[in-house]
Amino acid sequence: MSEQNQTPDAELDVQEFNNEMTQRRAKLAELRTKGNPFPNDFRRDQISNELHAAFDDKSQDELAAEKHYVKIAGRIMTRRIMGKASFATLQDMGGKIQIYVTRDDLPEGFYNEQFKKWDLGDIVGVEGYMFRTNTGELSVHTTSIRLLTKALRPLPEKHKGLTDQEARCRQRYLDLIANEESRRTFQIRNQVMNGIRNFLNSKNFMEVETPMMQVIPGGASARPFVTHHNALDIDMYLRIAPELYLKRLVVGGFERVYEVNRNFRNEGISVRHNPEFTMLEFYMAYADYNDLMDLTEEMLRTLAQNIHGTTKIRYAKDGEEGIEIDFGQPFARMTMVESILKYGNDVKAEELTTLEGAIAVAKRHHVELMKSWELGHVITAIFEETAEHMLHQPTFITEYPAAVSPLARRNDDNPEVTDRFEFFIGGREIANGFSELNDAEDQAERFQAQVAQKEAGDDEAMFYDADFVTALEHGLPPTAGQGIGIDRLVMLFTNSHTIRDVILFPALRPSNK
């Protein structure tokens, strides 16, 4: 088959694919007779984007006069053989660059006996000098070329790429080879992670690591994964959040700490949820939730400017036309009840002051309720149904009910709510933060209430953590803490419609099931 028609397994007839594999293995066998087809002694000195940065503004005459020599390496993505000369496109971590190969520039017989037998997907090392073709394309005039890795399987077809999302996630390595957009997504993810660390480090935060396996899972309301430690002969849990350990560190005197790491929750998979996900959590002593909102606003504005060169980005949730999100304007702030009244249409404020009234509102809006719920639970469920999806521009929702905020400090003016916010963009929760509860007796009572909910059938209710209560009894300074979902943040900055597009290897059902 021709190189122009090479396609991945899903696109090929089984017999055609088998023939392709047979041909490539035969080529590999022949190459082995002439030396090692997998050498490891080639060292490049530049990558493609560096070449473009250095020479894109050079004219054909300037390049010819300078004759700048380079050593590059990459995967053959396209090739045009024209008798005694060929053009090929190499792809590396920086992008793509064209190479020009002629028979006369290579050792006798090499062009026909080796180079022309290489396939798309093979990885080569090239030495040569920069020049510009008559059509104006920056290229490397090859003076030496070596095969570094023989590919036995064909690349995804170049015009279609790897378009099936399931296949893209399952074979991410092929997705990264074939789709420039996917490579860009994960490059931006790296920028987000680095940007967050740089920002927090500049604010005198210290990065720490806390246990991934815990005897008592805490810090969030979620169903944990359970494992067993053979040496200790105890069940342990993959962490659902690092919060309680980070606050222990604040008790110990590390007054500004953060952690960027994985959390695990044994729950459903959706466009917004993956059971293994990346979370930033940070805590600062002598601060409250208002300080966190200010810090979050500054951090996200800085990230947007540094990554995209502007504080305005476009986000198209679920494949819609999209909206412009402006990080340059002050972020909106409203209470949970205010948001329900704004977006709930027929909801009256007095209805949200009693359990009976709130249940009536919930029924009108077809909100499913649990019998054990208090007023705060019902109000939160109404908010999630009526208002959450309407919060397109950056918005902080404050005054979360104490019933759904077991770790947050109660509001001084209204103890039924807490000094807590959740942050929304594009109709999705991005962050959760609050002034920390540092009253050990109040915390113990709330843990006991969570235990009662768990006994009533709520699998996501928290365990009682006696050691954490003990830590609070030693004194936690006034503290504020926050968690930001990195995956959802990357979805926003890359205009991705599903969380699977921003996680390199997301959870998938086995292909044989």
Swiss-Prot record:
Mg(2+) 2 binds at residue 429. It holds the Pfam family tRNA-synt_2. It comes from the Bacteria. Signal peptide: none annotated. One of its GO terms (biological process) is lysyl-tRNA aminoacylation. It is an enzyme of class 6 (ligase). It catalyses: tRNA(Lys) + L-lysine + ATP = L-lysyl-tRNA(Lys) + AMP + diphosphate. GO terms for cellular component: cytosol. NCBIfam families: lysS_bact (TIGR00499), PRK00484.1 (NF001756). This is Lysine--tRNA ligase. It comes from Tolumonas auensis (strain DSM 9187 / NBRC 110442 / TA 4). The lineage of its organism: Bacteria, Pseudomonadati, Pseudomonadota, Gammaproteobacteria, Aeromonadales.
